[in-house]
Swiss-Prot record:
This is NADH-ubiquinone oxidoreductase chain 4L. Core subunit of the mitochondrial membrane respiratory chain NADH dehydrogenase (Complex I) which catalyzes electron transfer from NADH through the respiratory chain, using ubiquinone as an electron acceptor. Part of the enzyme membrane arm which is embedded in the lipid bilayer and involved in proton translocation. GO terms for cellular component: mitochondrial inner membrane; respiratory chain complex I. It comes from Lepilemur sahamalazensis (Sahamalaza sportive lemur). The chain crosses the membrane at residues 2-22, 29-49, 61-81. Keywords: Electron transport, Membrane, Mitochondrion, Mitochondrion inner membrane, NAD, Respiratory chain, Translocase, Transmembrane, Transmembrane helix, Transport, Ubiquinone. The gene is MT-ND4L.
């Protein structure tokens, strides 16, 4: 079991590193953020299953719902920025202010 949690933690760390390295493009940042949320989802499932703490089975599902909302808002921003400016650079998000 420690090897699975180590691999998932490594996947989270790689996604976090990708978020820091590829922070200029919105699509790359969204993909790295989704990888981080998926790793957190799997780690929370493993944590709950190891402790046999069945009361908190709702927490990973809540995390998945929040990840879906984050993805929807991120994709809406991506479509708005790419339709307005033709690029998906994060610096263009500052130009969308009223």
């Amino acid at each position: 079991m420690p090897s699975i949690s180590t691999n998932i933690t490594l996947a989270f760390t790689i996604a976090l590193t990708g978020m820091l390295v590829f922070r200029s493009h919105l699509m790359s940042s969204l993909l790295c953020l989704e990888g981080m949320m998926l790793a957190m989802f799997i780690l929370s499932i493993l944590f709950i299953m190891n402790l046999h703490y069945t009361v908190s089975f709702i927490m990973p599902i809540l995390l998945l719902v929040l990840a879906a909302c984050e993805a929807a808002i991120g994709l809406a921003l991506l479509v708005m920025v790419s339709n307005t400016y033709g690029l998906d650079h994060i610096q263009n998000l500052n130009l969308l202010q009223c």
